[in-house]
Amino acid sequence: MLALKAAYRLVPGDGGEATHRCELLPDDGAGRLLLRDAFEGEANASSVRAESDLAPFKPRCDVLVRATAWAPGEEPAERWTARLRVTGRGAPPPGGDAGGGEPPRRALVDKTLEVCGPRWFERAAEGWQLTRPEPAASVPVRWERAFGGRSLVRAAPGRAPLLDEVCFTNPVGCGWMEARTLDALRDAGAPAPDRVAAPQIERPDSRVTRLAVASHPPHAVEAPQMAEIAADYPFAPAGLGCVGRAWTPRLQRAGTYGEAWVAGRHPFLPDDFSFAYWNAAPDDQQIPHPDVGLRVELWNLARPGLACDGRVAFELPPHRAFAMAWIAGLPVPVPAALDTLSVDAESMVVTCVWRALVARALGVRRMEARFEVDPRAPLLKMAVGRG
């Protein structure tokens, strides 16, 4: 396996559908392969900022967005929407005549998030009441602002917590509570909270209307049971960034590591391992490995001063990454698939990761990473000597 990475700066475009264009950045760090996961805050206890680029294979292309949702015009509002759309070039009409224009584009991702200002679940005699959102000009699109959470009740120093349960679909979010939390707080002699944070990032089909109180078993559960329990959660988290490796449904794709695996497969992957585990994007942000002509559009996901009426749109350049594999003494170009497209709308930087796979049985003695910016150039260029 060979992985290549390139970074582009989004700069204002020259008109047309695209508001911005991609300008290739020099190798100043942004385009270097990431060797370990990077987090927004505490490692393994906050949103993943960017995942390691060392995945062996991704069956689909991850489309990931790191952004802040901005209210239109940067005017504080209680609610607004943000949107991500990714399209590819459509097939030409029969006969090849598109009327002099571009064929209709194919929608690969079209995702809308509902955003609101800070709000809370406040404890009252009749139960937890959801407050009206406070006006806000911006909200970071992080899993901490989406449905999920952790119920942690600490005991005396040096002792195990009285309770430590997480929402299996998003352990770092808010709006979720394990049913034993208030009892555990009372046993610990700790005060119960008067209010808890409510989600600010929602899916249109899963609006959070109440505090989700879930009952987990008092013992540890395996991945299949986690999925069954999570299926009963009343709401689903919403976001645009990496899904944690240990979250449902991604965890279940890692396979089963039981006694049968220890006896028959260890140290290799279990028989039910799915390479889809290596895809980090939410399922609705995974697309087939794209060809040239990919267009990305963002609405209300970039600072208004950098957007055009709240919209940022750009097309990926037709650059090609590939590996030159030397087989039996001859160079053989091996195309690399684009499997990770990351848009950081806060820094206006786009990164792409391509991955090339070559079978070990071919006896490759050497592989070289190559990057071609001329879409018309052949991948293999033969020098002609003059006698």
Where are these regions (language model features)?
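Extended intrinsically disordered or low-complexity segments
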Residues: 1-387
